[in-house]
Amino acid sequence: MESFARLLIAIPLVSYVLAVLSLWVGLQINSFIFPIAVCISVLWECSDKRIRGCVRWTTIVAVLVVLSVTLGLSACIYDRSFDGQWYHACTIRELVNGWNPIHSSACSPTPIDGYTVLWVEHYPRGIETIAATIVSCMGNLDAGKALNLWFVFSSIVYIYLFLCHCLPTMNKYLRIWIALVVALNPVVINQMCTYYIDWTLYTLSVSYTHLRA
């Protein structure tokens, strides 16, 4: 279970590192970054000697299935949020269309109004950068929202493992229920299918609790 959650977090984080490195050397975000990130993360997981072979491959297959299903669902679900449609999606679109924020402060590939430019150029864009690698690969602007589901799924698993470690005598179903309640708070549920990012720090912080246990 832990390797499943670890992979779901590793893939977007590796995508982010590759995207930033590409931008830093003067390249653009392209359709190869996300598949390469998946391959690197899977190879890294395969190299873990602590995991038995059958468990390792079962985990990898499960993660690939989750990636496929969530990408398909996200591509079909339209982001109806205000900020999600506005500067979040605009930032992703600019990155996909060739904007390099490291070497160019102006969003030049496509014309956008001055007020939106202020948000696109100066708002932190970590999640948007990861989403842009997904969108560039999938060719669908809404597909990047799958990232939300990966982080949420991993947080559920990590909370469950945290409870297993700290409260080993607790009923298994009660642990599952608590993990779902903690991971799926109202903000997370409301923003899970949008490009809002208010939930991100909470979800990653919750996942971090298992590492500190």
Regions inferred by a protein language model and the residue ranges of each:
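Transmembrane signal-anchor helices characteristic of membrane glycosylation enzymes that use polyprenol
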Residues: 58-83
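Conserved small/polar residues in nucleotide/adenosyl-binding loops
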Residues: 209-213
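Loop-to-helix entry region of an early transmembrane alpha helix in multi-pass inner-membrane enzymes
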Residues: 121, 125-128, 137-157
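Extracytoplasmic catalytic/substrate-binding loops of multi-pass membrane glycan-assembly enzymes
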Residues: 77-91, 97-130
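Membrane-embedded, hydrophobic transmembrane alpha-helices
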Residues: 1-54
